[in-house]
Amino acid sequence: MDYPLNEQSFEQITPYDERQPYYYPRPRPPFYPPYYYPRPYYPFYPFYPRPPYYYPRPRPPYYPWYGYGGGYGGGYGGGYGY
């Protein structure tokens, strides 16, 4: 018999058949700037000092007629003042 017995030599072997699969490089994670936590008091207090208490802002005066701030629309000519 003159033909080769292994059938692999009949297929055409190209250098592309032995090529390793190409893996795309992994994308870099997004860059977040470091977050600096506020520095704790060095001797750890179990109770931190109370934050300052801010009184709520006083409400603007309420004028029941139109043209002023307050009810019934307020502003210049706003609302349906009675």
Swiss-Prot record:
Report the subcellular localization.
Answer: Spore coat
Q: Which GO terms describe its biological process?
A: sporulation resulting in formation of a cellular spore
Report the transmembrane regions from the record.
Answer: none
Give the UniProt keywords, A-Z. Answer: Sporulation
Cite the propeptide residues by number.
1-19
Q: Where is the signal peptide?
A: none
Q: Which domain of life is it from?
A: Bacteria
Q: Does the keyword Lipid biosynthesis apply?
A: no
Q: What does this protein do?
A: Inner spore coat protein which seems to play a role in germination.
Other facts noted in the record for this chain: Present in an increased level in yabG mutant spores.
Name of the protein in its database record: Spore coat protein T
| Protein source organism | Bacillus subtilis (strain 168)
Which lineage is the organism of this entry classified under, starting from the top rank?
Bacteria, Bacillati, Bacillota, Bacilli, Bacillales
